[in-house]
Amino acid sequence: MCSTFILPPRRNNCNKSSSTIAYSKSQHEAPKQLLQLRSEIKPLIPLNQPSNFWESSQDSGVLSSLSSSPQQRSGLRSQKLHLTYIEKNKRVRAMIPQQQHYHAFDRPTHYNSRKTSGPPPLMRTPSSGFSSASSSENMFSGLTLSDNENKIHEIMDPSVDVDLDMFLLPDCRYKQPVQPSTSTSRNNVSQISGSSRLNGSTRHVAPIVPKVAMPSELSYANVKRSSGYVDYMPTTYNSNVTSNSSAASVPMSPGTWVRCHYCWESYVKLCQRVANLEPLISCDGPWNWHTLYDMQGRVTCPRLWFAQLDRAGSEMVEQMGHARNVPV
């Protein structure tokens, strides 16, 4: 962008050297970080100092025409000049979407205040999720250095705005399938109560009740996606059939594992609902998920699983009780 400046004759300023002008420029020129987009500026121009106004307008990169008539010059005191923003040194500003405009970008008066008057910017939109706050200029705009620390903890806190419905399973997963799916292993077919269609013939599968009633060694199926969220919830069990109770490995004592109190109470209530009088020992049954995370870093805390049991209703609990009460 090329601009031509026509310098008017200055009064009583011929003796100023170029170094003095450069020094006054460095005093009046704002640093690049403070150059903001100002839509309208009302300058206060003293009538007896027209040269000072020309220096300030020349420093800001704005060409304004000054007339010699005193009426027009006095009218400049109340006139609003719509200034044109000129990029210096070919600096490029990132374009900000219109829906994410924030008061901190056009704040000509109170940019020294600690907090801005506007609401905080939207961190998550339904379309883009966390990517809407990818730029640091968008995330921490309008904040001083003392406010950044609290804002970072507020944004990065994983307990903020966590929707538990993302852990919900589809309704079809609560019901036992008529035909075993690919995620159901052959060892697990015995646990399906109801009619199953195998080899073209319909027969009733009677579950084999081993001495270890509840299955252990929870196995995860392949990662599935439901409604856009990654679903890591368990789908199959590997039944641990042992003929000798002495041959079974001695489980670790519960005191050496991380235990969630809510999960343990929910597990005791579940065992009472399925007519099992005493809860099973640690590391047996669903309670071996109480280590909270598995080797791949996936959440295995049973708190979410028991919350799904409450939402699913009594149908799944009845099926679990029916699978135990069927005679061999």
UniProtKB/Swiss-Prot annotation:
Region Disordered, residue ranges: 56-78, 108-135, 177-200
Effect of residue 83 to A: Abolishes binding to fbf-2
Result after altering residue 85 to L: Weakens fbf-2 binding by 15-fold
GO biological process: regulation of gene expression
Polar residues bias locations: 178-200
GO MF terms held by the record: G-protein alpha-subunit binding
Annotated consequence of substituting residue 80 to A: Does not affect binding to fbf-2
Subunit structure: Interacts with fbf-2; the interaction probably mediates the release of the C-terminal tail of fbf-2 from the RNA-binding domain, thereby altering its RNA-binding affinity.
Functional description taken from the UniProt entry: Plays a role in germline stem cell maintenance, perhaps acting in concert with mRNA-binding factor fbf-2. May regulate fbf-2 by modulating RNA-binding and perhaps by competition with the intramolecular interaction between the fbf-2 RNA-binding domain and C-terminal tail.
Domain notes: Contains two Lys-Xaa-Xaa_Leu (KxxL) motifs, which are essential for the association with fbf-2.
Protein's UniProt name: Lateral signaling target 1 protein
Organism of origin: Caenorhabditis elegans
Origin organism lineage: Eukaryota, Metazoa, Ecdysozoa, Nematoda, Chromadorea
Gene: lst-1
